[in-house]
């Protein structure tokens, strides 16, 4: 175990004793803290690379656009923490760099973003085997996914370049994670 795992175990044990948690609740709390710590670590790595490459704001815009939709739309996940790092760097560092340096046609990006909103409308929310969506929440998550992706698309009609393309990129990336091609592989 590393330093952070030890600290997480200590804090989870403290919470277990303080709140009279049973063993299952203790494991859930510990897992939640481990996931949070890993995600914070990934964000630090990703944003540090973006800062070094002088694309911090573009990575941030892309990531926020992606996350605002993903929160409700869900979608495919990387098969492991390692692949999550690789995918995060590819999607939120490499793709923004490509959009920035190759000056992707505005009309093409607008068209792809519009198609992506259609994908969100058709497939959101997309549950996974590891992250099922309770039936009572599906309708609400679908509604918010559609509303948020539509609002983000409308915002791109009024925001100046290059920021528009990074909002659109976030919409496109999230829509791709909703496509059914990922779900046969995941199961």
Swiss-Prot record:
GO terms for cellular component: plasma membrane. It comes from the Bacteria. Signal peptide: none annotated. SMART domains: AgrB (SM00793). It is found in: Cell membrane. It is a multi-pass membrane protein. The keyword Transmembrane helix applies. Its EC number is 3.4.-.-. InterPro entries: AgrB (IPR006741). Keywords: Cell membrane, Hydrolase, Membrane, Protease, Quorum sensing, Transmembrane, Transmembrane helix, Virulence. It holds the Pfam family AgrB. GO terms for molecular function: peptidase activity. The chain crosses the membrane at residues 49-69, 82-102, 107-127, 143-163, 164-184. GO terms for biological process: proteolysis; quorum sensing. Belongs to the AgrB family. HAMAP family: AgrB (MF_00784). Essential for the production of a quorum sensing system signal molecule, the autoinducing peptide (AIP). This quorum sensing system is responsible for the regulation of the expression of virulence factor genes. Involved in the proteolytic processing of AgrD, the precursor of AIP. This is Accessory gene regulator protein B. The lineage of its organism: Bacteria, Bacillati, Bacillota, Bacilli, Bacillales.
């Amino acid at each position: 175990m590393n330093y952070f795992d030890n600290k997480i175990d200590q804090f989870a044990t403290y919470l277990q004793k303080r709140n009279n948690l049973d063993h299952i609740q203790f494991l859930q709390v510990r897992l939640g803290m481990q996931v949070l710590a890993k995600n914070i670590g990934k964000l630090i790595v990703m944003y540090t690379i973006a800062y070094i490459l002088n694309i911090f704001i573009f990575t941030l815009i892309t990531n926020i656009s992606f996350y605002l939709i993903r929160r409700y739309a869900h979608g495919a996940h990387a098969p492991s923490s390692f692949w999550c790092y690789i995918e995060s760097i590819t999607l939120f560092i490499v793709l923004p760099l490509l959009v920035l340096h190759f000056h992707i046609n505005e009309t093409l990006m607008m068209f792809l973003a519009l198609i992506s909103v259609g994908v969100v409308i058709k497939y959101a929310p997309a549950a996974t085997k590891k992250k099922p969506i309770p039936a009572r929440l599906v309708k609400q998550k679908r509604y918010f996914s559609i509303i948020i992706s539509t609002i983000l698309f409308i915002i791109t009609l009024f925001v100046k370049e290059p920021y528009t393309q990074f909002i659109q990129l976030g919409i496109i990336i999230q829509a791709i994670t909703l496509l059914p091609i990922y779900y046969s592989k995941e199961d």
